[in-house]
UniProtKB/Swiss-Prot annotation:
InterPro entries from the UniProt entry: Urease_beta-like, Urease_betasu_sf, Urease_subunit
Keyword Transmembrane helix found: no
Annotated family: Belongs to the urease beta subunit family.
Taxonomic source organism: Streptomyces griseus subsp. griseus (strain JCM 4626 / CBS 651.72 / NBRC 13350 / KCC S-0626 / ISP 5235)
The name this protein goes by in its record: Urease subunit beta
Catalytic activity annotation: urea + 2 H2O + H(+) = hydrogencarbonate + 2 NH4(+)
Pathway named in the protein's UniProt entry: Nitrogen metabolism; urea degradation; CO(2) and NH(3) from urea (urease route): step 1/1
EC number(s) stated in the UniProt entry for this protein: 3.5.1.5
BP terms from Gene Ontology: urea catabolic process
Pfam entry (one): Urease_beta
Cellular localisation: Cytoplasm
Subunit relationships: Heterotrimer of UreA (gamma), UreB (beta) and UreC (alpha) subunits. Three heterotrimers associate to form the active enzyme.
A GO term from the CC aspect: urease complex
Length: 103
């Protein structure tokens, strides 16, 4: 082994395996692109995005950590969302949740 070397197994590692997936169509009604990061509470995303916010409550994008999805103006996009896990507390952001998701 070389110091700092990372050894990993063969094959792909599935993202969010076993988590329920919610599919929504999102339309960017704004006049410029909007980007949403992997762990952002999707229901509180930019108000220029049109989608079922109630269905997105407590969910985040089903994408790799540290990545984002860019929504171009006027172009509908289908997304997959998975539940936020851990303590399920969302402080701050746009102030619509401001704490525990399950309260």
């Amino acid at each position: 082994m070389i110091p700092g070397e990372i050894l990993h197994g063969d094959g792909d590692i599935p993202l969010n395996a076993g988590r329920p997936v919610t599919r929504l169509t999102v339309l960017n009604a704004a006049d410029r692109p909007v980007q949403v990061g992997s762990h952002y509470h999707f229901a509180e995303a930019n108000p220029g995005l049109r989608f079922d916010r109630a269905a997105a409550h407590g969910l985040r994008l089903n994408i790799a950590a540290g990545t984002a999805v860019r929504f171009e103006p006027g172009i509908p996009a289908d997304v997959e969302l998975v539940p936020l896990t851990g303590r399920r507390v969302v402080p701050g952001l746009r102030g619509e949740t401001g704490g525990a998701l399950d309260a």
